[in-house]
Amino acid sequence: MDILVARTGDEIGQAFERLSQAQILGCDTETSGLSSRYGRLFSVQFSDGEFNVLVPVSEGVPLGQLAEVLTDASITKIFHNAKFDLDFLSENCYSVENIYDTMIAEKVLTRGANQSASLAETLYRYFAVDLDKSQRAKFNRKWDGIWTDELVDYALSDVIHLPRLMAEQMTWLDKLGLSEEFERQLGKILPANNANKNE
């Protein structure tokens, strides 16, 4: 796994050079809690499926040029439960264009099947990937802010799989004639200009 923890302007620039060339990017955040109003944004993660970047916002590192990747409408940003991440990004003055939500896609695909749409269970169903969520409990208001290798790996473990998951889901949405329903459901939680432009 090619990992960059981007702390300097040069590292942000290096990440931008590579990620700005992507057509799709997995994106995620780590936060201190569930409420963007009262919680803190600790990090923003990006992955093209091979190159994985974590920006440690908790250390005072701004996204810099990477904010342009979020607003670039030619790049699809893939989130799992986009509304959660978008709330925290918005609270920190970052906007995002062209969004795909793997959780909404999974809910559309599994409607009536009594299956969880959590990322851990979804990735296990598709790829037999077993996500270790044990590190998640460390991200709270009392966290010391130190990004250990284990925390970096945990934070990036979600985003690395999102590009491949989106491809699989889009294939199934198309095969089952559910693409329009997915767009309709996505539109319910996102402003119209943020929906996935690849459909």
Regions found by a protein language model. Give the residues of each.
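N-terminal accessory regions of nucleic-acid-interacting proteins
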Residues: 1-25, 29
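Short, flexible, glycine/charge-rich loop motifs used to bind or transfer phosphoryl groups or to couple energy/partner
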Residues: 14-16, 34, 65-68
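Short, surface-exposed beta-edge/turn micro-motifs
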Residues: 22, 40-41, 74-75
